[in-house]
Amino acid sequence: MAGLWHETNTFAVEQNDSMETIHIKRGDALLPQEHVRNFMGGFIEGANRPDVELVPALEIGFSHGGLIHAKVYEHCRSMIVDALREAKPLDGVYFAFHGAMVAETPYTDAEGELVQEARRILGDIPMVGTYDFHAIMSDLEIQSLVPFPNNTNPHIDGYERGLEAAKCLLQMLDGTIQPITHRVLV
């Protein structure tokens, strides 16, 4: 389980230009969210089976709504990738994303590049992700994981999307489904 949560407003004055602008939860600090009605809480509750061991890696959020500086993004991505690498071997991965993060150039797809790097180090294992209603999901994400975005506005169904993501991941691990995802632009 890993999370990277930020909705960037590229017009915002306050930018995320230092590590002091991030909030980090590591390891078991993610687990108290079990009964919280958000993405992570739904996933944790939905994956609660005797044969499942949850491996909480890292969740990162940001203080300001503005652009993520390249060095800050690189550091955050490295922390998540390193935590996933240390947790190997893993059977599957759950990501909690907002899906509208913008980092400085040269990064044009913050969440997608993170998912691609996770796929590179972990191999062909099932991956799912939850997203905010207005996420900008890229081909990198669609090709690498099964997305579960909010269905409602206001966004009151994060918990339900977490439950769905857990159910899907468990079914993929059990071998009962093999989802195929496509991006449809509207």
Residues of each region from the PLM?
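Internal, active-site/partner-interface "lid" segment
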Residues: 173-186
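Short, glycine/charge-rich beta-strand/loop segments that flank catalytic centers
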Residues: 59-64, 95-98, 135, 183-186
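Low-complexity, highly charged intrinsically disordered N-terminal segments
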Residues: 44-85
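Active-site-proximal beta-strand elements of phosphoester/diester hydrolases
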Residues: 2, 57, 149
